[in-house]
């Protein structure tokens, strides 16, 4: 009870927190709800070739409210990543990278969430997810025995679903532990705020004002997920229709399109001529997030309002550039697209490098 009280009730926060500081609470609740809904689905899922697709279909048709739980779990991960991207952008804009351990643990949560979402995407054994796993399996072949350990063989086969199901169960538990560490270091070092000014007279308890604000926001988000599950009003969150077809190893889709939150990395793989180059570029984009932490050594005063012009001109164009990169991931590969995609990837690297460089000159 003392731990609950110190971190959720009596925890002191700045008075000037705005809507951007609700994203972390939303992500925590969505993660717990994903674990609960995933646990419910695991009671009926059979990780075997042929049976995986049939068991998923049986949940949709034969289990009371099974369709809602399955669709909630499917769309919940889209909302989870949507708010995670907003949370990362908030951290970049308001210099949260100057809280190093919070940023490091956040990057670990992001990477583990991507891995969890990918293996979960493969589990229904649909046509699109099967060939998506085949593409990733081809990228990891040079890891040798590690690839066999993860996929159960050199290619995607019956053992792959069993391995992926185990990974999909274990990784959320690890993420939850990292989230607890993330909260610990955040509350130990203190929350950031829009002005980045620590004034002991301008703080108050997390409960009730901020807590009720977070609860109100998460209720709205859960209602949106419910409406999305019933009506599918956000088309980009919908899965590809080919994933509603049982996987066929002898029939390759005309174009492989992963879930929208994986498009950034898939586009990075597409625009490079070799698998190794694409994989290194994808790892490099994640490494840039880590390098943002090291920019804290370049200046002692953290300021979000008195920012240098270079910081604004680097962070604002980064958003449409990332949208362009994601759009390229949905397109069919051709020579012109590769040229455009290469320019977009270089632009992402350039803008983040400018963020690093501008940290030296921000006031």
From Swiss-Prot:
<keyword id="KW-0813">Transport</keyword>
<keyword id="KW-0349">Heme</keyword>
<dbReference type="InterPro" id="IPR036150">
    <property type="entry name" value="Cyt_b/b6_C_sf"/>
</dbReference>
<feature type="transmembrane region" description="Helical">
    <location>
        <begin position="210"/>
        <end position="230"/>
    </location>
</feature>
<comment type="function">
    <text>Component of the ubiquinol-cytochrome c reductase complex (complex III or cytochrome b-c1 complex) that is part of the mitochondrial respiratory chain. The b-c1 complex mediates electron transfer from ubiquinol to cytochrome c. Contributes to the generation of a proton gradient across the mitochondrial membrane that is then used for ATP synthesis.</text>
</comment>
<feature type="binding site">
    <location>
        <position position="187"/>
    </location>
    <ligand>
        <name>a ubiquinone</name>
    </ligand>
</feature>
<dbReference type="Pfam" id="PF00032">
    <property type="entry name" value="Cytochrom_B_C"/>
</dbReference>
<feature type="binding site" description="axial binding residue">
    <location>
        <position position="168"/>
    </location>
    <ligand>
        <name>heme b b562</name>
    </ligand>
</feature>
<feature type="transmembrane region" description="Helical">
    <location>
        <begin position="271"/>
        <end position="291"/>
    </location>
</feature>
<keyword id="KW-1133">Transmembrane helix</keyword>
<keyword id="KW-0812">Transmembrane</keyword>
<feature type="transmembrane region" description="Helical">
    <location>
        <begin position="310"/>
        <end position="330"/>
    </location>
</feature>
<dbReference type="GO" id="GO:0006122">
    <property type="term" value="P:mitochondrial electron transport, ubiquinol to cytochrome c"/>
</dbReference>
<dbReference type="InterPro" id="IPR016174">
    <property type="entry name" value="Di-haem_cyt_TM"/>
</dbReference>
<keyword id="KW-0479">Metal-binding</keyword>
<comment type="subunit">
    <text>The main subunits of complex b-c1 are: cytochrome b, cytochrome c1 and the Rieske protein.</text>
</comment>
<dbReference type="GO" id="GO:0046872">
    <property type="term" value="F:metal ion binding"/>
</dbReference>
<keyword id="KW-0472">Membrane</keyword>
<dbReference type="InterPro" id="IPR005798">
    <property type="entry name" value="Cyt_b/b6_C"/>
</dbReference>
<feature type="binding site" description="axial binding residue">
    <location>
        <position position="73"/>
    </location>
    <ligand>
        <name>heme b b562</name>
    </ligand>
</feature>
<feature type="transmembrane region" description="Helical">
    <location>
        <begin position="332"/>
        <end position="352"/>
    </location>
</feature>
<feature type="transmembrane region" description="Helical">
    <location>
        <begin position="67"/>
        <end position="89"/>
    </location>
</feature>
<dbReference type="InterPro" id="IPR005797">
    <property type="entry name" value="Cyt_b/b6_N"/>
</dbReference>
<dbReference type="GO" id="GO:0008121">
    <property type="term" value="F:ubiquinol-cytochrome-c reductase activity"/>
</dbReference>
<feature type="transmembrane region" description="Helical">
    <location>
        <begin position="164"/>
        <end position="184"/>
    </location>
</feature>
<dbReference type="GO" id="GO:0005743">
    <property type="term" value="C:mitochondrial inner membrane"/>
</dbReference>
<keyword id="KW-0830">Ubiquinone</keyword>
<dbReference type="Pfam" id="PF00033">
    <property type="entry name" value="Cytochrome_B"/>
</dbReference>
<feature type="transmembrane region" description="Helical">
    <location>
        <begin position="102"/>
        <end position="122"/>
    </location>
</feature>
<feature type="binding site" description="axial binding residue">
    <location>
        <position position="182"/>
    </location>
    <ligand>
        <name>heme b b566</name>
    </ligand>
</feature>
<keyword id="KW-0999">Mitochondrion inner membrane</keyword>
<protein>
    <recommendedName>
        <fullName>Cytochrome b</fullName>
    </recommendedName>
</protein>
<keyword id="KW-0408">Iron</keyword>
<dbReference type="InterPro" id="IPR027387">
    <property type="entry name" value="Cytb/b6-like_sf"/>
</dbReference>
<keyword id="KW-0249">Electron transport</keyword>
<keyword id="KW-0496">Mitochondrion</keyword>
<feature type="transmembrane region" description="Helical">
    <location>
        <begin position="23"/>
        <end position="43"/>
    </location>
</feature>
<comment type="similarity">
    <text>Belongs to the cytochrome b family.</text>
</comment>
<feature type="binding site" description="axial binding residue">
    <location>
        <position position="87"/>
    </location>
    <ligand>
        <name>heme b b566</name>
    </ligand>
</feature>
<keyword id="KW-0679">Respiratory chain</keyword>
């Amino acid at each position: 009870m003392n731990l609950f009280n110190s971190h959720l009730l009596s925890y002191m926060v700045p008075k000037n927190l705005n809507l951007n500081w609700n994203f972390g609470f939303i992500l925590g609740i969505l993660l717990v709800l994903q674990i609960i809904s995933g646990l419910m689905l695991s009671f009926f899922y059979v990780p075997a070739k042929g049976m995986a697709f049939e068991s998923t279909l049986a949940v949709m048709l034969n289990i009371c409210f099974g369709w809602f739980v399955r669709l909630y779990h499917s769309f919940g991960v889209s909302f989870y990543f949507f708010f995670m991207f907003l949370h990362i952008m908030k951290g970049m804009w308001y210099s949260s990278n100057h809280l190093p351990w919070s940023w490091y643990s956040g990057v670990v949560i992001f990477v583990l969430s991507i891995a969890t979402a990918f293996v979960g995407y493969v589990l229904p054994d649909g046509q699109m997810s099967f060939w998506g796993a085949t593409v990733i399996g081809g990228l990891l072949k040079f890891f040798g025995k590690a690839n066999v350990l993860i996929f159960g063989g050199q290619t995607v086969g019956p053992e792959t679903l069993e391995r992926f199901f185990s990974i999909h169960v274990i990784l959320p538990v690890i993420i939850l532990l990292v989230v607890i560490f993330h909260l610990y270091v955040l509350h130990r070092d203190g929350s950031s705020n829009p002005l980045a000014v620590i004034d002991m007279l301008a703080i108050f308890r997390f409960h009730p004002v901020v807590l009720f604000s977070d609860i109100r926001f998460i209720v709205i988000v859960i209602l949106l997920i419910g409406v999305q599950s019933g009506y599918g009003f956000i088309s980009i969150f919908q899965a590809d229709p080919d994933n509603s077809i049982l996987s066929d190893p002898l029939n390759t889709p005309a174009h492989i399109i992963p879930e929208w939150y994986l498009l950034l990395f898939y586009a990075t793989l597409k625009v490079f001529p070799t698998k190794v180059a694409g994989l290194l570029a994808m790892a490099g984009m994640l490494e840039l997030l880590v390098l943002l932490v090291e920019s804290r050594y370049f200046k002692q005063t953290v300021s979000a309002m008195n920012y240098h012009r270079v910081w604004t001109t680097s962070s604002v164009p980064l958003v449409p550039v990332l949208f362009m990169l994601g759009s390229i991931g949905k397109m069919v590969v051709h020579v012109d697209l590769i040229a455009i995609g290469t320019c977009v990837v270089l632009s992402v690297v350039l803008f983040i490098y400018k963020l690093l460089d501008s940290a030296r000159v921000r006031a």
